[in-house]
């Protein structure tokens, strides 16, 4: 990563260039600004962030800039992280989780195993973060897998997207692979008629007016991480590294709480502006579960390395067993 070193009267100022696809003034951008404010205060202006929010393309574009040294850090989702290591997709297994608490337990356990993989490739994880629960948004109501098969579904073109897109297609879905920055024009022109995203993203990017039906099904949690290259980390004065790590660690729970609190508010705001929630009854839910379980053998190994797929489900089952015992 490239660090801008600007001489001052006493010390050199370290500017960490960090990018995210999150739009300016979104909840994620707001929290990054809080981290920057606290970091500048704690370091007396010696270290600061220069944040690029929603201006440098999609997550693959951001990572390319990181790799060539134009950027030092990134706040990206597992969709982008998967281009560094496929194992990060373990936290995005469809219909594997039913609650925030369950997902958090699994995330914390899996993260400990993912961080060394990213470190081996030159990236230090400052924190993991929630983006929200992914739902389907569509131009026509979608309650069942067959309903979704009638739509032109956006799938991510970054990370390990080829295998993911093929899996969707193998199960009869009509997919269009695009960069996230192309979702809006694709919706406007009818190139796509459905997309997957957390409600906060659908609202922040103003995608939902063009796909005004949201399926009431928590498809998967979308998790992200703030990463910095080891090269950039080493250029931060040693006495300030722990300060940065502590500030990020202290802000992480605040972001998590805000994301969870605002998710329902985002849905309410969209409903007031025309969004319709499509109910998924038990028969439809069973159809989704059957479709997903049929796909698990192909997800395991091709999209998520077998070891991490198994570990994710093991931790989930462990949480459920512990929670069941606690309620007896």
Give the ranges of each region predicted by the language model.
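N-terminal signal peptide c-region/cleavage motif recognized by signal peptidases
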Residues: 6-9
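N-terminal secretory/targeting leader peptides
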Residues: 12-102, 113, 118-328
């Amino acid at each position: 990563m490239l660090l801008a070193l600007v001489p001052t009267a006493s010390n050199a100022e370290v500017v960490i260039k960090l990018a995210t696809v999150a739009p300016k003034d979104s909840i994620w951008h707001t929290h990054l600004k809080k981290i920057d404010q606290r970091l500048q205060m704690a370091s007396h202006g010696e270290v600061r962030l220069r944040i690029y929010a929603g201006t440098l393309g999609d997550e693959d574009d951001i990572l390319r800039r990181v790799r060539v040294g134009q950027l030092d850090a990134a706040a990206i989702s597992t969709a982008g992280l998967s281009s560094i290591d496929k194992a990060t997709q373990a936290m995005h297994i469809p219909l594997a989780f039913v609650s925030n608490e369950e997902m958090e337990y699994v995330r914390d356990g899996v993260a400990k195993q993912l961080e060394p993989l990213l470190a081996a490739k030159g990236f230090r994880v400052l924190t993991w973060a929630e983006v929200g629960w992914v739902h389907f948004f569509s131009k026509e109501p979608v309650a069942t897998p067959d309903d979704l098969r009638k739509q032109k579904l956006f799938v991510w073109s970054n990370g390990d997207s080829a295998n993911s897109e093929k899996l969707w297609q193998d199960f009869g879905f009509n997919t269009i692979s695009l960069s996230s920055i192309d979702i809006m024009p694709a919706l406007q022109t009818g190139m796509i008629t459905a997309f997957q995203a957390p409600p906060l993203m659908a609202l922040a990017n103003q995608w939902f007016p063009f796909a005004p039906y949201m399926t009431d099904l928590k498809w998967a949690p979308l998790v992200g991480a703030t990463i910095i290259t080891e090269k950039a980390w080493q250029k931060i004065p040693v006495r300030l590294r722990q300060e940065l790590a502590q500030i990020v660690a202290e802000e992480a729970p605040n972001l998590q709480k805000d994301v969870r609190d605002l998710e329902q508010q985002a849905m309410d705001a969209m409903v007031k502006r025309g969004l319709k929630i499509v109910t998924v009854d038990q028969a439809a839910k069973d159809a989704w579960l059957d479709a997903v379980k049929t796909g698990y053998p192909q997800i395991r190994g091709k999209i998520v390395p077998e070891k991490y797929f198994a570990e994710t489900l093991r931790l989930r089952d462990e949480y459920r067993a512990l929670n069941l015992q606690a309620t007896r």
